[in-house]
Structures are given as structure tokens and as C-alpha cells.
């Protein structure tokens, strides 16, 4: 399909720079294909679910993956920013460098140069490989838990480019850009649909008998990469590591067997479950890298309802929601959201999407 079919105009003022407070006070647009749109708020979610339904959350935890460093070449010093996006070993990470052209393979970058990164000293890495789009493989002097500690001390919250270009990260972001149930460290971007959940909302869902299950997909910085191809067939999707354990797969299969709905909280949960689903829709234990790319025409196997934020024009995620609820339905929904002042992107409002064929 032509990528320009997924384009739309978004006024700059619709981009949220801070989240709603409290989290579950964010607005939520309910989209049922063929039915009128409903303007709600996130804490209304329980009224759209039934006893025995199951919410699936991504429990990945965001690490402070944006590192500022310097590259020395004789008397010349260049400022380099690295955004870690996938761990490649105990002492190495794949990262996007900016500006990548100022660093050659074999050169070293010193991070945390304005102070010690951990009790052992500063955080240094060697550029072992360079790839496309500014990607590089960094091999650090530290390894394992010591490297993790150094990154935590030297790193910044990896806010998305559309926020970071307007303001610096601060201490508030360390809490705001993390779900309340995050536990598996490794993401460099938040699974943002989950940011709306609060203990009170969990209690309300428990009261009506909605199940909660957790999977892990470490969201990479590639989620923000633009689609440069003119046709979706030519786009190369980034890979992310995820896992669905056997107990979770069995529990979700049981939900389906008794007629319950499976609700993915976020596109990361959806992409992971679709990767783990057999053609019949049966879920199995699964782990590994997924580069699943969902566009209109895809037949969903594992998910009935999707809760997700509002996405960028021409993005793979807007393509995904268009596949889920229909392209024309989503264009109409986004037009309504823009007209009604909904807040977009990672810190923005939410939508509750019903599948086109349900």
C-alpha cells in the first residue's frame, strides 16, 4: 500500500509534552467500526469490559538509555549522543548515534564525562560496527550489572524526539515515563498505553472480574524511526525482543475458550501476542526477536480489543491501528480527535479500538 494513504495533518499544539494527572484522567476515544465515536476518559474503561475478559500488559521497564558523550581525535572533540536500543551482550548495546558521521569504527566515546558514572569511574565504549541510519554497535569497558549501574547513573530518560526537541528531560519524567507495573528492565521507550493505569483503575477492573496478564517486549528506539519508503512493501521493520511465558499463553487461551475478550494494552502487547499466535489463534510460549509489520489486510488472530495512544502520521503504528479497525474508520477517528482537542503521542490521550470484524 502507498504510505501516503496513512498521512494526516496534526497541529503542533496537539502534541502532549506532559501526561495527564492523575494518569487515568486522560481522555479516551472509543472506536467501534460502523458505530458513533464515544468521548470518554480512561477511568471509564471498566464499563466497556465484561467479567472474564483479560487485559494484557507489557511489563517492560524503561532504562535511562540516552547517553551524552564525547569523541576525542587529537585536539578535536566532538559531542556525540547515543540512544541505546537493543542489548547485544553483557558488555554491548546496539545504539543510534547522533551525529553518526563524526565517529568511525574503532574510535572510543566517553560517556558521563561531566562526572563519574559509577564507583569504578567513567563510562567508555568502543564503536565496534556501524550500520544504516546512524546505528552502531557499542562495546563498553564495563559489563553486566556494573554496566547497568553506570548507564543508570549517566543516562537520561529517552524521551521521544517530538518531546525532546521541545524540552529537556527532568526528574518528573523518571516517574511519568514508566508504567506503575514495570519490572523487566530493557526498554528504551515506554509502552505508552500502559501509562494511563493507576491502582484505583486496577481496583475497579478487579471488582468486575477482569483478568490482568503480563508479557514482556523491550521497546526499542526504532519505534520512532520514520517510514521513508513510498510503499509499505519496501519498509524494513525494526526488531524487538519479547517473551510470552507458557502460563500466560495457557491463561489467555482459557479466556478465549470460555468466550472472553483479550484486550491488548498497547501496540507492543498486540505485536508480541500476534507473533506468539498460531494460525488458529492458539497462543503458545514464545521468546525471541519479532519484526512483525502489520498493515491493512492482516488477519488478527490473538486480539479482540486494543487500547492505544494516538500515533504519528505515516507511522507503522498508525498502519497497525488502521489494519485493526479499518483505515477510513481510523482517519475519521483521528480527525475527530484533532477537532475535539485530544492530546497526541506518548504523553497524550488514549483510544479504545474494537476490531473491524468483531
Swiss-Prot record:
Where located? Answer: Cytoplasm
What NCBIfam families would the database entry show?
PRK00147.1, queA
Q: Which UniProt keywords apply?
A: Cytoplasm, Queuosine biosynthesis, S-adenosyl-L-methionine, Transferase
Example of a GO MF term: S-adenosylmethionine:tRNA ribosyltransferase-isomerase activity
Kindly state which reaction or reactions the protein catalyses. 7-aminomethyl-7-carbaguanosine(34) in tRNA + S-adenosyl-L-methionine = epoxyqueuosine(34) in tRNA + adenine + L-methionine + 2 H(+)
Major site of localization recorded for this protein: cytoplasm
The record's section on PANTHER family has: S-ADENOSYLMETHIONINE:TRNA RIBOSYLTRANSFERASE-ISOMERASE
Phylogenetic classification of the source organism: Bacteria, Pseudomonadati, Pseudomonadota, Alphaproteobacteria, Hyphomicrobiales
Pfam families in UniProt: Queuosine_synth (PF02547)
Member of which family? Answer: Belongs to the QueA family.
Summarize subunit and interaction data from the UniProt record for this chain. Monomer.
Which terms in the GO cellular component ontology are assigned?
cytoplasm
Name-wise, this protein is S-adenosylmethionine:tRNA ribosyltransferase-isomerase
What does the UniProt function comment say about this protein?
Transfers and isomerizes the ribose moiety from AdoMet to the 7-aminomethyl group of 7-deazaguanine (preQ1-tRNA) to give epoxyqueuosine (oQ-tRNA).
User: Which EC number(s) are documented for this chain?
Assistant: 2.4.99.17
Q: Can you supply a Gene Ontology BP term from the record?
A: queuosine biosynthetic process
Q: In which pathway does it act?
A: tRNA modification; tRNA-queuosine biosynthesis
Amino acid at each position: 500500500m502507498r504510505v501516503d494513504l496513512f498521512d494526516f495533518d496534526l497541529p503542533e499544539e496537539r502534541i502532549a509534552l506532559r501526561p495527564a494527572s492523575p494518569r487515568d484522567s486522560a481522555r479516551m476515544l472509543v472506536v467501534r467500526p460502523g458505530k458513533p465515536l464515544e468521548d470518554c476518559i480512561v477511568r471509564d474503561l471498566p464499563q466497556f469490559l465484561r467479567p472474564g475478559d483479560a487485559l494484557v500488559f507489557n511489563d517492560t521497564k524503561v532504562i535511562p538509555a540516552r547517553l551524552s558523550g564525547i569523541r576525542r581525535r587529537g585536539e578535536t572533540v566532538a559531542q556525540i549522543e547515543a540512544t541505546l536500543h537493543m542489548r547485544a551482550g553483557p558488555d554491548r548495546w546496539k545504539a543510534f548515534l547522533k551525529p553518526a558521521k563524526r565517529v568511525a569504527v574503532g574510535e572510543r566515546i566517553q560517556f558521563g564525562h561531566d562526572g563519574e558514572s559509577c564507583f569504578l569511574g567513567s563510562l567508555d565504549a568502543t564503536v565496534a560496527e556501524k550500520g544504516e541510519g546512524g546505528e552502531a554497535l557499542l562495546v563498553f569497558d564495563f559489563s553486566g550489572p556494573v554496566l547497568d549501574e553506570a548507564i543508570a547513573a549517566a543516562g537520561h530518560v529517552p524521551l521521544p524526539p517530538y518531546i525532546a526537541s521541545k524540552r529537556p528531560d527532568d526528574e518528573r519524567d523518571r516517574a511519568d515515563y514508566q508504567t506503575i507495573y514495570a519490572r523487566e528492565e530493557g526498554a528504551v521507550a515506554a509502552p505508552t498505553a500502559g501509562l494511563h493505569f493507576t491502582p484505583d483503575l486496577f481496583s475497579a477492573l478487579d471488582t468486575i472480574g477482569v483478568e490482568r496478564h503480563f508479557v514482556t517486549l523491550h521497546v526499542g528506539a526504532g519505534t520512532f524511526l520514520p517510514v521513508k519508503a513510498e510503499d509499505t512493501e519496501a519498509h524494513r521493520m525494526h526488531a524487538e525482543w519479547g517473551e510470552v511465558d507458557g502460563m500466560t499463553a495457557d491463561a489467555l487461551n482459557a479466556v478465549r475458550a470460555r468466550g472472553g475478550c483479550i484486550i491488548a494494552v498497547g501496540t507492543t502487547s498486540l505485536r508480541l501476542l500476534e507473533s506468539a499466535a498460531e494460525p488458529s489463534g492458539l497462543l503458545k510460549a514464545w521468546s525471541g526477536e519479532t519484526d512483525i509489520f502489520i498493515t491493512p489486510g492482516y488477519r488478527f488472530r490473538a486480539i479482540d480489543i486494543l487500547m492505544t495512544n494516538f500515533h504519528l502520521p505515516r507511522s507503522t503504528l498508525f498502519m497497525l491501528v488502521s489494519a485493526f479497525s479499518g483505515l477510513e474508520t481510523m482517519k475519521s477517528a483521528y480527525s475527530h480527535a484533532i477537532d475535539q482537542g485530544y492530546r497526541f503521542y506518548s504523553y497524550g490521550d488514549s483510544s479504545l479500538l474494537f476490531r473491524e470484524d468483531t
